[in-house]
């Protein structure tokens, strides 16, 4: 199995292939039932099984390895691999070193953690160990033991890979790199990390004079420079943290490179993958930030396909936009790879969270509509932790397709239904596309926040007002972009694509009727120039809530302002504005950009009747600027987005009589699939027509059960 880059899907035996896998943890299941679980998985239409290979489970004590079940029958990894082959199932293996998976010590051997010196662990700014199971990724000690583990497990994987007629087709490198840093907001200040950081800074700036000019500091030499810590008080602190974020993206790339080179040295030629976390408390607004942390890996390792951890916990209208948004952002970041879900929720990790089969089935179909090209049901089979190995307790996952004893649960039939649809339609469905006339810009520097904002502890090191700013980048990307614009476009049934603004060209941008940018007060010169050229060459740009006048280090950079010939001031006003005749539009900040431009058309006003939004012809294109921030909390916000979209005569593909119904049309030159999605807990009955055929007869009535779906296939 390999990815088909030109159309971004997997290929198996020369044919388009939708990757359907199920997570089955051999070490959490009675070995007598292994075959039952595999057979029942295959009977759903899946052709792949996925599992971690816990280092702790197989290296019981230092140099005491067991892969054949000599000390415990569930350690017989080789037998499990052979069973996969016998059942004609491909196998995805995840040998760590980290596995997480609610396994004690995240899968690292307890003997190892006791033996490692303090300098092998991630340390806080005071030199204290952050957590007893959190090592410093590039610690020489840790890598030495990791390689010893690889020396034992990789020959087994190599022997059983596909080219040697084994079942193994894919391997995951480590697991959710950087996730602890995101959750805790604590950086690794291990001495080796700090030395690498200083090397990074020297390579980036070359001379201390160059750094001083950017930071507005007066260091005598690079020896005076320290890694940033604590709260941001000065602009120089902000600059240092910005570079610290850049450094850690390179640091993760270095770690992955070391692991990959070691793995390839064993003659392992299968596809490699890594998983991206980010769903938390039923929302995925943080997942794009975590995608950004892997940007250097994606740039330097095109042979690693990144997969999303799509774990919504409970699916609802409130988070229904999240899978599409994350799919689109990942596609923008690795445009030559299929979008797939390395962990695709099947069941629930926490007993108090209920994940019902009907809801998940609708989520699975919605993900197909939203362009997913493969997924791994996580967990397909429930597990029972070996004694002392469960992080939270004995049972691992609830409401799965199979319980640990291989009994079918309610989700099994839903998975089988979805899989059968995929297998029947995959050759056509994988070759379909969605017609998108709207493009949304993804600007990675707005996502550099994991080191200054704790997800779990809710600690913030950045107060933008202390730097003379008013737009917090985290609020911008979460509430204005992700939960605002992207949710609004999907709710209104407008298709959109996402583009990486730092890795695109003018030609690709001008192919769209509109480009939307949610912007802070800062943006680098190159991107400001790109947006200027986009408009001058005929593009339609919608920019809000601010025209950037600073670069990413908060130095003056007014390229957009000057090239567009606009003048404005920033001042406080009421939280409500009027725009396009829509009254009482609630804005997130009291501060607004107030425009003074006689050559533009006013489109939005404060309650003091000052102009806070304009449209202006520039070159061959048109600029629309809103100097206020809005998300999606009211119907006025949806109406405003709708008005902006219609400025350039963009239409929905269908007219649907019930606006609560979301729909997606995927098509190629042979087939059209119409997905109708009811994210509401009430039955919906409606008619639909193509937007180009509004005068023609309406369709027959369609009725969809509460929180369900309907797929209609039309042959052209």
Curated annotation (Swiss-Prot):
Effect noted on mutating residue 343 to G: Shows glycosynthase activity only in the presence of glucose as an acceptor among the examined monosaccharides and disaccharides
Enzyme Commission number(s) from the entry: 2.4.1.391
Recorded effect of pH on activity: Shows high activity at pH 5.0 to 8.0.
Active site: 176, 343
Domain of life per record: Bacteria
Record-listed beta-D-glucose 1 binding positions: 176, 278-279, 349
Thermal response of activity: Optimum temperature is 55 degrees Celsius. Stable up to 60 degrees Celsius after incubation for 1 hour.
Reactions accelerated catalytically: a D-glucoside + [(1->2)-beta-D-glucosyl](n) = a beta-D-glucosyl-(1->2)-D-glucoside + [(1->2)-beta-D-glucosyl](n-1)
Name of protein: Beta-1,2-glucosyltransferase
Biological source species: Ignavibacterium album (strain DSM 19864 / JCM 16511 / NBRC 101810 / Mat9-16)
Lineage: Bacteria, Pseudomonadati, Ignavibacteriota, Ignavibacteria, Ignavibacteriales
